[in-house]
């Protein structure tokens, strides 16, 4: 394990402390809660609720924390903050509350959560120990206020005289807990809680339907959006309700708010010395018979469990096996309809479910296992500690255990988070750490990496404490440490004393199913966010139309968002971090006011050109980290107000001639990490307001010429391309240019005066290029330039240029390495004088502005002597992983070098200073070497070296090749006259052996047209059948002479688009169009390249839209057409009918062929989720609605005391058994703790190293939580 620097340790320790918790099990009766069952006190005096938080073991805990507003401890409000006495924080451990002001004694702690309901926790604190007493859920905000004395006063329900009791509407005044404050503005006041976009559906409905506002009897006017300053007017907007203060007087003031369907809200405020203060907010409450009926407990869930139990009993032939279940079920059936206590109802449901699960589970002791598969639970703590390890949250709570016939066991565990940082994992078995088999499962992220991994390994005695071992790059682990378990971070692992027979999958898989699929999942999310106004568990068109302002749907794993087409009043929409594969064409058509749209990190492959047609108000559009391969012409033409556009991290390999039409106000364009080889001449012309462009990490050989026309540009980033020169750009036309980043390219020359007139330049970055000299005449007349020319081929610079370099260093330079290539027969040999590792270490140790520059190899070697170690060891001490790639490259027709052979040195190797490659063909070659570094799962090429060029006139085996070429050249010797010829052709993959799928899409008899001595190929394409769908070629390009094949056999070089001779048409004769595209070419013509006359191979680039829709990125393919010159003839042979050809002509005869899978799916009616239970209505509303009528009859009641008592006794017995089991688990836990204590006494020597690593691990989890920003990080 690499050492951790003192500076890093100090910084980390300042943010995260490694603490152990002490938990004492309550000796008092435990009031069960589904979410909170324990509270602990950490050594840094923080109350810890570990069952709620982003990494909680239950999915409910992971969701609940998101909506916590504050915490109240004995009437003292605690706010979320890292500093202050009355504060709390939520991190990977759970909720941590500052306990500095909490004295010894009994306390009540309320977690305030308006969406999911408050939780009241009672506990006793004594010294450094906490005893948990109870936790009770108080209900959501809409329900809980009926339980609090300060919310609703007692209600009187008068009754009519007569034989039938009729409940009249009784009214009292009650305080409203959601309207509690105001803020004073200039000539106005604001009630922020009276919010038309409130998450509370009652407040939201009341605000949106306000009909009148009066202040001291003066009727106020709705000013819509005008200023209310010093007026008798009001405005309701996104910040709340604003009132002008013109009608306010000194002393008490009364504000009455009337709203359709609601009783009036009366707010009292006082004014003194110009200051206005909130006093109260009240509203009349009423109780009707209808209300009373609505308070009847919902037994739907219990009845569902009763049906489940009935089915089990009916199916079980061995009635003794279900005797206990049957007896308890009968008691519940006899009395559940008379339950009036919600707690008793919940306990009854739990009793029945526990009995069912006990029957189904068939729990088995870990000491009595037979052959089979089991479900196992585990606990992972930091080594020699009671505090949970990060592994507890990074792995699924369930583990799979397989017991084989010979008694040996194998355990499988699923890593669900931070997988990109986890290098390896193992659990000690029989005193050693077995190598685990890692299986990547589930979905991939945008970089092609799997999010989840399953680790499987042998394990022995489950009854003892096991040591776990993790190798994590974020904790200093390196790939070179793999299987060196002494360098792994250790943790303590214990397993449950019983296992469950069978295996139903990991918990995350169960959670995924519960979330629903398609629109059902989106609907569930919207319901959870409070957008279901009528409480029926569904989202109607009307409810969707009521969604206004900002809507955050990021990181919910959504796949289908078509439901949002009715949400026409959204102005800001966050959809990043989901799994959306397509955007329905009309999805945003009604969102006329949409100003912000974030679709980052989804699975989009294609956007229809009309997607944003109706969104003229859009200002910011983020489409990065998707799989988009191309941009439709006119896609953005309606976005006249767009200012920010990010298309980074996609698969865009080509642009149409005018992809940015209409974006005259765009100021920032992100296009990094795509596959662009060139940008069309006019593509950037509409971007007249652009001041920032990022083209980094593409395959550009030149900057686009039109960039010089964008006079507003201030920043150009084009690093990590293949740019060889910049003299095609007149930078003098960019007067505002401030930053130019061209680092890591292949620029060898800077023309004189190229930046002479760019007086606004503040930064020029040419790091890691091939510059041999830098003259003063290149730069403007400025004092400093922040010029970076490190890692070039520069031997010296003038004092003026040295001043422009500023705090950067000039050394090291690449020429120091002296990488040289030479031809030796049929081999190219290389030799290098100075290691890549030394160049890298030299740069790293002099990178800081305060570091002294080393200007010679001798000074660097002196540094090594002072360090007293070799370069490999020094880099390992810096926690760097690296590899070295050595490539043989050949020059292609486009001037770029293509790698045709390579060697990879991995696992922190020494540099290979000498070596050789075998040659295959004539051409221009060079050697390229690159150092690839990896830190914290981020890998990049840091520095490269190139040798001199080697010209090979004839390759090996040239005599044999000449014979082949001479045979093919006989075609030319015939001196073909102008005319039409025919020959056979087939389509091959780049391995030149396998048949390409496109082989089924061509007429295998191609036409050779000779015109004025120039040969052209004409190829007829056909429809290609994919399953039941029919697709067509979208575009065809061919590689010109001089192309080269890379290591994978893929051609690299310049391409030209083939000429379209004719298009496919439909039955009406119009150009064929379907959901994937239109104007599909049928016959195409291309010039026959000279190389094809020699080897019969024509390299092509084809794009098939339907293939890309089926599998992202698969639509654009490189293939070879193989020509059979032996079949050349002047007679057009009849085309043999092919059985796998889906269509013999260009006409479609069925409209079904035009329908894609989505069109057919849209014809089906989507299934809606079942309706939620009605729940309690007006009595528990924070805002009372007006009565719509009175009940005519009160339901008669019956009371069977014996049955109710029998049920209560059954519940009490069940709770007692649970408490007994809990006490036993506590005793076992104490025993394990004592065992660990004995181990700890023997492990003091490694303790300090452990705390160092543990501290770093805690910090990295916190930091990465912010970086990754995933709501479902540790699922």
From Swiss-Prot:
Pfam families attached to this UniProt entry: LRR_8 (PF13855), NEAT (PF05031), Shr-like_HID (PF07550)
Region (HID 2): 203-269
Activity regulation field: May modulate heme uptake according to heme availability. In the presence of high heme concentrations, NEAT 1 facilitates fast heme delivery to Shp, whereas NEAT 2 serves as a temporary storage for heme on the bacterial surface. When heme availability is limiting, heme from NEAT 2 is transferred back to NEAT 1 and from there to Shp.
SUPFAM superfamilies assigned to the protein according to its UniProt record, in alphabetical order: L domain-like (SSF52058), NEAT domain-like (SSF158911)
Biased amino acid composition, Basic and acidic residues: 1196-1205, 1210-1229
Domain NEAT: 369-501, 976-1138
GO terms for MF: metal ion binding
Domain notes: Contains two structurally unique N-terminal hemoglobin-interacting domains (HID 1 and HID 2), which are joined via a structured linker domain to a C-terminal region that contains two heme-binding NEAr Transporter domains (NEAT 1 and NEAT 2), separated by a series of leucine-rich repeats (LRR). The N-terminal domain mediates binding to hemoglobin. It contains two hemoglobin-interacting domains, HID 1 and HID 2, which are autonomously folded and independently bind hemoglobin. The linker domain may position NEAT 1 near hemoglobin for heme capture.
Protein name in UniProt: Streptococcal hemoprotein receptor
Species the sequence originates in: Streptococcus pyogenes serotype M1
């Amino acid at each position: 394990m690499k050492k951790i620097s003192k500076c890093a340790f100090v910084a980390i320790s300042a943010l995260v402390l490694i603490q152990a918790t002490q938990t004492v099990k309550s000796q008092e009766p435990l009031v069960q809660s589904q979410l909170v069952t324990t509270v602990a006190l950490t050594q840094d005096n923080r109350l810890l609720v570990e069952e709620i938080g982003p990494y909680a073991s239950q999915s409910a805990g992971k969701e609940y924390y998101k909506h916590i507003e504050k915490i109240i401890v004995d009437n003292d409000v605690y706010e979320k903050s890292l500093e202050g006495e009355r504060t709390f924080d939520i991190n990977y451990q759970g909720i941590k509350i500052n306990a500095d002001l909490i004295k010894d004694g009994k306390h009540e702690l309320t977690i305030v959560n308006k969406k999911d309901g408050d939780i009241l926790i009672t506990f006793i604190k004594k010294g450094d120990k906490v005893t948990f007493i109870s936790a009770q859920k108080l209900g959501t905000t809409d329900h809980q206020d009926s339980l609090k004395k300060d919310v609703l006063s007692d209600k009187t329900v008068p009754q009519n005289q007569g034989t039938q009791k009729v409940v009249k509407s009784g009214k009292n005044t009650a305080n409203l807990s959601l309207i509690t404050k105001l803020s004073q503005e200039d000539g106005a006041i604001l009630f922020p809680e009276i919010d038309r976009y409130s998450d509370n559906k009652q407040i939201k409905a009341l605000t949106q339907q306000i009909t009148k506002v009066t202040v001291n009897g003066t009727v106020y006017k709705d000013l819509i959006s005008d200023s209310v300053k010093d007026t008798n007017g009001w405005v309701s907007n996104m910040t709340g309700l604003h009132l002008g203060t013109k009608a306010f007087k000194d002393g008490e003031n009364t504000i009455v708010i009337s709203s359709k369907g609601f009783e009036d809200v009366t707010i009292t405020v006082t004014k003194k010395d110009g200051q206005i203060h909130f006093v109260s907010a009240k509203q009349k409450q009423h109780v009707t018979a209808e209300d009373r009926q609505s308070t009847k407990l919902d037994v739907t869930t219990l009845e569902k469990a009763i049906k489940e139990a009935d089915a089990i009993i009916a199916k079980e032939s061995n009635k003794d096996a279900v005797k206990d279940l049957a007896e308890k079920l009968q008691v519940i059936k006899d009395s559940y309809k008379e339950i009036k206590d919600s707690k008793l109802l919940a306990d009854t449901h739990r009793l029945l479910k526990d009995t069912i699960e006990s029957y189904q589970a068939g729990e088995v002791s870990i000491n009595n296992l037979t052959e089979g598969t089991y479900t196992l639970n585990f606990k992972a703590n930091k080594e020699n500690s009671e505090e949970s390890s990060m592994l507890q949250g990074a792995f699924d709570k369930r583990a799979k255990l397989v017991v084989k016939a010979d008694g040996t066991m194998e355990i499988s565990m699923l890593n669900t988070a931070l997988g990109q940082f986890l290098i390896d994992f193992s659990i000690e078995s029989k005193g050693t750490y077995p190598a685990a088999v890692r299986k990547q499962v589930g979905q991939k992220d945008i970089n092609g990496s799997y999010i989840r991994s399953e680790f499987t390994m042998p394990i022995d005695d489950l009854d003892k404490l096991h040591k776990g071992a993790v190798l994590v790059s974020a904790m200093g682990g390196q790939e070179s440490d793999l299987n060196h378990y002494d360098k792994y971070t250790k943790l303590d692992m214990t397993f449950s004393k019983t296992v469950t027979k069978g295996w139903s999958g990991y918990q995350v898989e169960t959670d995924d199913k519960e979330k629903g699929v398609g629109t059902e999942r989106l609907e569930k999310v919207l319901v959870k966010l409070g957008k279901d106004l009528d409480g029926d568990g569904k989202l109607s068109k009307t409810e969707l139309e009521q969604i206004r302002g900002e809507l955050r749907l990021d990181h919910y794993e959504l796949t289908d968002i078509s439901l949002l087409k009715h949400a026409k009043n959204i102005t800001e929409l966050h959809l990043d971090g989901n799994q959306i594969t397509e955007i329905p064409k009309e999805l945003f058509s009604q969102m006329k006011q949409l100003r912000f749209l974030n679709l980052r990190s989804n699975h989009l492959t294609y956007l229809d050109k009309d997607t944003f047609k109706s969104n003229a108000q859009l200002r910011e559009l983020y489409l990065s980290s998707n799989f988009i391969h191309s941009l439709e012409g006119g896609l953005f033409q309606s976005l006249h107000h767009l200012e920010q556009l990010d298309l980074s991290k996609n698969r865009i390999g080509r642009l149409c001639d005018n992809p940015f039409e209409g974006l005259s106000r765009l100021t920032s364009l992100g296009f990094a990490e795509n596959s662009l080889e060139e940008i069309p001449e006019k593509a950037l012309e509409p971007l007249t307001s652009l001041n920032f462009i990022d083209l980094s990490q593409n395959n550009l050989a030149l900057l686009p010429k039109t960039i010089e026309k964008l006079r507003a540009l201030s920043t150009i980033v084009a690093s990590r391309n293949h740019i060889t020169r910049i003299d095609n750009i007149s930078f003098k036309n960019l007067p505002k240019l401030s930053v130019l980043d061209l680092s890591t390219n292949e620029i060898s020359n800077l023309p004189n005066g190229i930046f002479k007139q760019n007086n606004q330049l503040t930064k020029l970055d040419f790091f890691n290029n091939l510059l041999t000299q830098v003259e003063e005449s290149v730069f403007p007349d400025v004092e400093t330039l922040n010029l970076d020319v490190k890692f070039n081929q520069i031997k010296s610079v003038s004092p003026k240029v040295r001043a422009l370099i500023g705090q950067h260093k000039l050394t090291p330079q690449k020429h120091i390495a002296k990488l040289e290539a030479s031809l030796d027969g049929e081999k190219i040999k290389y030799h290098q004088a100075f290691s890549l590792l030394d160049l890298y270490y030299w740069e790293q140790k002099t990178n800081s502005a305060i570091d002294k520059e080393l200007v010679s190899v001798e000074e660097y070697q002196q540094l090594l002597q002072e360090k007293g170690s070799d370069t490999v060891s020094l880099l390992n001490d810096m926690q760097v992983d690296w590899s070295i790639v050595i490539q043989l490259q050949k020059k292609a027709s486009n001037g770029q070098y293509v790698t045709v052979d390579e060697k990879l040195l991995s696992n922190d190797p020494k540099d290979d200073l000498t070596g050789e490659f075998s040659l295959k063909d004539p051409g221009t070659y060079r050697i390229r070497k690159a150092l690839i570094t990896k830190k914290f799962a981020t890998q990049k090429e840091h520095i490269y070296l190139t040798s001199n060029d080697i010209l090979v006139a004839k390759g090996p085996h040239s005599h044999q090749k000449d014979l082949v070429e001479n045979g093919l050249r006989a075609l030319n010797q015939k001196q073909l006259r102008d005319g039409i010829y025919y020959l056979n052709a087939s389509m091959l993959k780049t391995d030149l052996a396998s048949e390409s799928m496109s082989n089924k899409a061509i007429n295998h008899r191609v036409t050779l047209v000779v015109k004025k001595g120039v040969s052209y190929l004409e190829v007829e394409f056909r429809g290609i059948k994919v399953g039941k769908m029919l697709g067509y070629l979208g575009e065809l390009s061919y590689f010109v002479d001089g192309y080269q094949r890379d290591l994978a056999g893929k051609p690299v070089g310049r391409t030209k688009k083939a000429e379209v001779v004719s298009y496919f048409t439909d039955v009406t004769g119009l150009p064929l169009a379907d959901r994937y595209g239109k104007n599909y070419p049928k016959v195409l013509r291309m010039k026959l390249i000279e190389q094809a006359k020699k080897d019969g191979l024509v390299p092509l680039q084809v794009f098939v839209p339907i293939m890309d829709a089926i599998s992202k990125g698969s639509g654009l393919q490189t293939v070879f057409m193989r020509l059979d010159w032996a079949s050349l003839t002047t007679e057009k042979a009849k085309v043999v009918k092919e059985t796998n050809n889906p269509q013999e002509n260009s006409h479609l005869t069925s409209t079904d062929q035009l329908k894609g899978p989505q069109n057919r799916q849209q014809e089906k009616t989507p299934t809606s989720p079942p309706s939620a239970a009605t729940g309690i209505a007006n009595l528990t509303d924070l805002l009372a609605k007006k009565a719509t009528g009175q009940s005519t009859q009160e339901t008669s009641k019956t009371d069977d005391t014996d049955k109710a008592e029998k049920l209560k006794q059954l519940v009490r017995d069940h709770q007692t058994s649970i408490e007994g089991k809990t006490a036993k688990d506590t005793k076992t836990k104490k025993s394990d703790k004592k065992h660990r204590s004995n181990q700890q006494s023997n492990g003091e020597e490694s303790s300090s190293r452990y705390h160092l690593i543990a501290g770093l691990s805690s910090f990295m989890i916190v930091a990465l939580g912010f970086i990754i920003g995933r709501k479902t990080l540790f699922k």
